[in-house]
Amino acid sequence: MKEKGTPNNQENEPSPEANEAPSPFFSVQTPMGEFSVDMKEFADAKAAAYAMMPKQKRSNLFDSKMFTFLEAAKTQRDSRYWRGHLGALMKAHLDVYLEPEFEVVEEFLIEEGVFRPCLYDTIPLQGNKRQRIMVLGTRFYQSKITPEHRFTLISSVDGDGDHRVTLHVPAGRNMNTERYDFSNFINQLEEDFYKAGPLNGAFFDLKYNFIERDPNIDNLLAWDSKVKETLWSDIITFQKAMPKLKELGLSNSRGVILAGPPGTGKTMIAKWLAAHSDITCILISAEMITGRQDIKKCYELARKVSPTLLIIEDIDTAGALDRRAADHPLLGEFLQSMDGIVPNHGVIPLATTN
């Protein structure tokens, strides 16, 4: 590397420019050719960048209010999002989950430096019920038992419509109780949601839309008595035996396929079984299945809210299946799940096919 404008003089022959300031340029050889860098401009740009950086992190209005409430200088943060209607249901369960030991002492929404009321929405639940949830806003929670146990919960919606919950607890403060572990709070919330939340025992589809059980569906079916008795025994009666089978370490899962031409009432029979089931029922239409991962997710969800009747409509057309393709990977995934090769404790898959 050589400074531009410097002559090739001998060391004992001083240059006329010897007393001038050194050139601020230096050149760099690259495969694309030579280019020059003005070190003065580079230094000025670097200084300007440093000048723009804050010398210290300043607390905004929210931080100041939060730290004052928590009586802490630092917080431990946990955050998670859930897609679409699942996120709204998770927020609905949050109130139920916290109610035994915590109460809201203040809630607000800050927009452009101004405190405003939180934004709420009302969502449908099973049984034509509805529940109000906080969509956007912040809540300050305080223990009903130990008042110094406090935390902040922020409810928000991401740009793509996913619902998010963010938790702040005082760093280094042990607030764990027999019910709540604040170092693992959101995982515990999810676990309780699937165990005792609004999906448990409900009838819904893969997009978490609730389906009402029709009490008059018996009047809409013309039954073959033997088919009715077999289905009642293999599905409805079996449901009641599932807890005991699990207790004894025996298989409490089985699969059923309803086959017949279109219009013979297969879907109606599946809904009849759901109407008479006391367990969670999930209805999955063929267009909701596009790949093996979708199948796995269906069974993962069914296991989480088990015992579950998992109804899969038109299994032969799911994921653009050809019913003649016996070695199709999607069909193989279904069959493995149904015959117990993949453990699905507490899940009864019921598939319909043409």
Regions found by a protein language model. Name each.
Residues K2-K240, S253:
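AAA+ P-loop ATPase mechanoenzymes
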Residues D218, A222-N354:
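Walker A/P-loop NTP-binding motif of AAA+ ATPase domains
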